[in-house]
């Protein structure tokens, strides 16, 4: 491609409303243009990257036995009503009526539609297994779209759905997709982790997220550097401290703590170690009763773990201030298990503590020297906290570390959640109807671009991996419109690279060198060759990788092989 025939539109500054680096750079480099909140036009340079991502995904899905379909963006309400998601989905599901007053929705996902197709088309066990996928536009009416394409309302997603005759076969389909996802993200050239995850609103009981590692990531990824253990923060297990609980050595004493409402204030007031304090959180049980949950002062309650405890409302609901006063006779900041007659749930770490400091269920009062079994009943014990860096790994192979990540893919084993709700069955070997065992597998195609940039950029612009760069190589002739020698050398290298199947751009716009280089550093082309009169007189041209601080002089007659070696 010649730049004079392409569309290049770069900006020196990003709009003031751009939130994060990837959004700023994509707008400045002319990859996207905003049309409305969370809705963007894909410009030619950005669309090239999208198409390359789609190609890699499509190749690996086909390799894994996926069958491509295209499902409607507009979906009838009746299917969503069958699963109950028409009401449960909330405002993110954009609903509308057609001219006949029939209800429809713009698809945020396609479980209902594909399950409807399966129940009509896959009638026998002989038709299984099947795995259908699409790469299609989705729409979720986010309350506060932000971060550019990372959390837009309209986006492109690859979603796949597997149908199997048994849970065992569904597990094989899951493993097949997990392996395909690893190949996809390996080929995309991104640093990522596959982590065990909570199934969330999708449902099911087996799930992995694929997280691109980036300091700006929203998600905390927990892993063990010396083993294969990895999970997101919601699911990572906090191992109980080793050994038995120490014996009580202090008497229970009530201490006046005026205006102390937080753990930090308590530690400062009493001049104690935060690890000797216990934090009290009140949540609602299934019967709307107050349930007291306890974590160590320096730990945080894990809401996903907490709502999975039997008898606790799911999703988790925190008790109101009025309900807390009714149950404890005190306000938040002064609560504890001593004297409380309701249900008490302690984290594993708290259950091993002795002589701890806790609220006394009187405003501005705390207990020191509190102990389970002596001063209050033994609590129920569950893992209900977030892990922290340095915690022992659940597999016993070392200590945990935490990185930030951006979720770009997710695989779920659904079981019969949707097939049972929609009466989607097949006939087994005995001629009896059975619901399909299902899995669903998503990749945020356009989200990948934002994640890749958040992982790969510098103060000059983006740095694309070779596999998804808009152009792998850019040839930058200095004086293309003035020097016949430069034009001849640039045209020859351009033609030779094209003949070798290289995705190359020849910048023949006649821009000043500084402006030309700045454009391609912003756009992030990984390999650049600069050709100028001065160098050619010495038989040299310059090669520079986007990550290199300096260019390298290369013999003009060797530059083709040099570039090809860098692309290998």
Curated annotation (Swiss-Prot):
It holds the Pfam family tRNA_edit. CDD domains: ProRS-INS, ProRS_anticodon_short, ProRS_core_prok. One of its GO terms (biological process) is prolyl-tRNA aminoacylation. InterPro entries: aa-tRNA-synt_IIb, aa-tRNA-synth_II, aa-tRNA-synth_II/BPL/LPL, Anticodon-bd, Anticodon-bd_dom_sf, Pro-tRNA-ligase_IIa, Pro-tRNA-synth_IIa_bac-type, Pro-tRNA-Synthase_IIa_type1. GO terms for molecular function: aminoacyl-tRNA deacylase activity; ATP binding; proline-tRNA ligase activity. Its EC number is 6.1.1.15. GO terms for cellular component: cytosol. It is found in: Cytoplasm. It catalyses: tRNA(Pro) + L-proline + ATP = L-prolyl-tRNA(Pro) + AMP + diphosphate. Keywords: Aminoacyl-tRNA synthetase, ATP-binding, Cytoplasm, Ligase, Nucleotide-binding, Protein biosynthesis. Belongs to the class-II aminoacyl-tRNA synthetase family. ProS type 1 subfamily. PANTHER family: MITOCHONDRIAL RIBOSOME PROTEIN L39/PROLYL-TRNA LIGASE FAMILY MEMBER, PROLINE--TRNA LIGASE. NCBIfam families: PRK09194.1, proS_fam_II. Catalyzes the attachment of proline to tRNA(Pro) in a two-step reaction: proline is first activated by ATP to form Pro-AMP and then transferred to the acceptor end of tRNA(Pro). As ProRS can inadvertently accommodate and process non-cognate amino acids such as alanine and cysteine, to avoid such errors it has two additional distinct editing activities against alanine. One activity is designated as 'pretransfer' editing and involves the tRNA(Pro)-independent hydrolysis of activated Ala-AMP. HAMAP family: Pro_tRNA_synth_type1. Homodimer. Consists of three domains: the N-terminal catalytic domain, the editing domain and the C-terminal anticodon-binding domain. This is Proline--tRNA ligase. It comes from Chromobacterium violaceum (strain ATCC 12472 / DSM 30191 / JCM 1249 / CCUG 213 / NBRC 12614 / NCIMB 9131 / NCTC 9757 / MK). The gene is proS.
């Amino acid at each position: 491609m010649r730049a004079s025939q392409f569309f290049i539109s770069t900006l020196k500054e990003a709009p003031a409303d751009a939130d994060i680096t990837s959004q700023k750079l994509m707008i400045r480099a002319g990859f996207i243009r905003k049309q409305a909140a969370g809705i963007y036009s894909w410009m030619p340079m950005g669309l090239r990257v999208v198409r390359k991502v789609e190609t890699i995904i499509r190749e690996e899905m086909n390799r894994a036995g996926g069958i491509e379909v295209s499902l409607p963006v507009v979906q009838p309400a009746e299917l969503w009503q069958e699963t109950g998601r028409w009401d449960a989905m909330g405002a993110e599901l954009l609903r509308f009526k057609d001219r006949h007053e029939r209800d429809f929705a713009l698809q945020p996902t396609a479980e209902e539609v594909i399950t409807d197709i399966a129940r009509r088309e896959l009638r026998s066990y002989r038709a299984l297994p099947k795995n259908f996928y699409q790469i299609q536009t989705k729409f979720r009416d986010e309350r506060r779209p932000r971060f550019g394409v990372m959390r837009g309302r309209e986006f492109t997603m690859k979603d796949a759905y597997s149908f199997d005759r048994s849970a065992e076969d569904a597990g094989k389909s899951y493993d097949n997709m997990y392996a395909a996802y690893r190949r996809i993200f390996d080929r995309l050239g991104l640093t990522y982790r596959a982590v065990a995850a909570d199934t969330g609103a999708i449902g099911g009981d087996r799930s992995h997220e694929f997280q691109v590692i980036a300091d700006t990531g929203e998600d905390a990824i927990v892993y063990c550097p010396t083993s294969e253990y990895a999970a997101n923060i919601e699911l990572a297990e906090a191992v109980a401290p080793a050994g038995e609980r120490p014996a009580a050595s202090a008497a229970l004493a009530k201490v006046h703590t005026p205006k102390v409402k937080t753990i930090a204030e308590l530690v400062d007031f009493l001049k104690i170690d935060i690890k000797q304090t216990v934090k009290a959180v009140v949540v609602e049980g299934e019967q709307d009763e107050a349930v007291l949950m306890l974590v160590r002062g320096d730990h945080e309650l894990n809401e996903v773990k907490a709502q999975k405890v039997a008898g606790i409302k799911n999703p988790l609901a925190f008790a109101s201030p009025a309900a807390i006063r009714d149950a404890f006779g005190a306000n938040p900041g002064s609560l504890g298990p001593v004297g409380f007659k309701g249900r008490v749930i302690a984290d594993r770490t708290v259950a091993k503590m002795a002589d701890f400091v806790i609220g006394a269920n009187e405003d501005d009062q705390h207990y020191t020297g509190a102990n389970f079994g002596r001063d209050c009943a033994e609590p129920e014990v569950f893992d209900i906290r977030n892990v922290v860096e340095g915690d022992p790994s659940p597999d016993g192979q070392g200590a945990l570390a935490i990185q930030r990540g951006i979720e770009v893919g997710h695989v779920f084993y659904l079981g019969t959640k949707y097939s049972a709700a929609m009466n989607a069955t097949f006939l087994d070997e005995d001629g009896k109807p059975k619901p399909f065992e299902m899995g669903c597998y998503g990749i945020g195609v356009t989200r990948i671009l934002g994640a890749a940039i958040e992982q790969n950029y510098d103060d000059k612009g983006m740095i694309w991996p070779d596999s998804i760069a808009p152009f792998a190589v850019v040839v930058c002739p200095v004086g293309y419109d003035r020097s016949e020698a430069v034009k001849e050398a640039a045209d020859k290298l351009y033609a030779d690279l094209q003949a070798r199947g290289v995705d190359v751009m020849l910048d023949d716009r006649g821009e000043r060198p500084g402006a030309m280089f700045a454009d391609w550093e912003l756009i992030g082309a990984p390999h650049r060759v600069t050709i100028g009169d001065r160098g050619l007189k010495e038989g040299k041209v310059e090669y520079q990788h986007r990550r290199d601080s300096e260019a390298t002089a290369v013999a003009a007659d060797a530059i083709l092989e040099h570039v090809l070696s860098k692309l290998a």
